[in-house]
Curated annotation (Swiss-Prot):
Pfam families in the record: Ribosomal_L4
InterPro entries the UniProt entry points to: Ribosomal_uL4, Ribosomal_uL4-like, Ribosomal_uL4_dom_sf
Family per similarity comment: Belongs to the universal ribosomal protein uL4 family.
Protein's organism: Rhodopseudomonas palustris (strain BisA53)
Residue runs in coiled coils: none
The protein, known as: Large ribosomal subunit protein uL4
GO cellular component, one term: ribosome
Keywords recorded for this protein, A-Z: Ribonucleoprotein, Ribosomal protein, RNA-binding, rRNA-binding
């Protein structure tokens, strides 16, 4: 699969050959969905907490005698049916993470990349560098490329000027190749890869 390479200024910079094993698959939405669910579950804080009857600070004395009052039998004021009592089956601090095999995660990433390529949402640029961290200049470059919502993936190290300039632009994410993931690929309209990112992906899945 051959794709044109452009510069940030929108000039032609040749072409690149993309591996069909990574970018040319028939996308499987079920595998992509499994990976997205895994990612979103893993990032949940799980810090929700409600006090149960054992954690409520209240007297443990029996409310009134067992017999002779005509009222229902009660032993504790900490039970859920009373105002101020403990919560029955309330949320507890826990991890929401689920297991997903590494092979399935790797497969999902390939299918997400293939889905972008199939939909025409994949752009390859020669490099993502700026001499100075000027957001205004980068906004102009993105307008020329037609980027309003994009995930930009560079090599192992980001260019500091580019990363700082892009930080304040809405709907633009910049990540090193180590941070590429299915959810971020899907949540933006365009996926922009540098040539270094393409080489790193092909080396990763070789």
């Amino acid at each position: 699969m051959e794709l044109k390479v452009t510069t940030l200024e929108g000039k032609d910079a040749g072409s690149v050959q993309l591996s069909d094993e990574i970018f040319g698959l028939d996308p499987r939405s079920d595998i992509i969905q499994r990976c997205v669910i895994w990612q979103l579950a893993k990032r949940q804080a799980g810090t929700h907490k409600a006090k149960g009857r054992a954690e409520i600070w209240r007297t443990g004395k029996k409310m009134y005698k067992q017999k002779g009052t005509g009222g229902a039998r009660h032993g504790s004021q900490r039970v859920p049916q009373f105002r101020g009592g403990g919560r029955a089956f309330g949320p507890v601090v826990r991890s929401h993470a689920i297991d997903l095999p590494k092979k399935v995660r790797a497969m999902a990433l390939k299918h997400a990349l293939s889905a972008k390529a199939k939909d025409g949402g994949l752009i390859v640029i020669d490099q993502a560098t700026l001499d100075s961290a000027k957001t205004k200049a980068l906004v102009g470059h993105f307008a020329g490329l037609g980027l309003t919502s994009a995930l930009i993936i560079d090599g192992a190290e980001l260019n500091n000027g580019f990363a700082v300039a892009a930080r304040n632009i809405p709907n633009i994410d910049v990540l090193p190749i180590q941070g590429i993931n299915v959810y971020d690929i899907l949540r933006r309209q365009k996926l922009v890869l540098t040539k270094a990112a393409v080489d790193a992906l092909e080396a990763r899945f070789k």
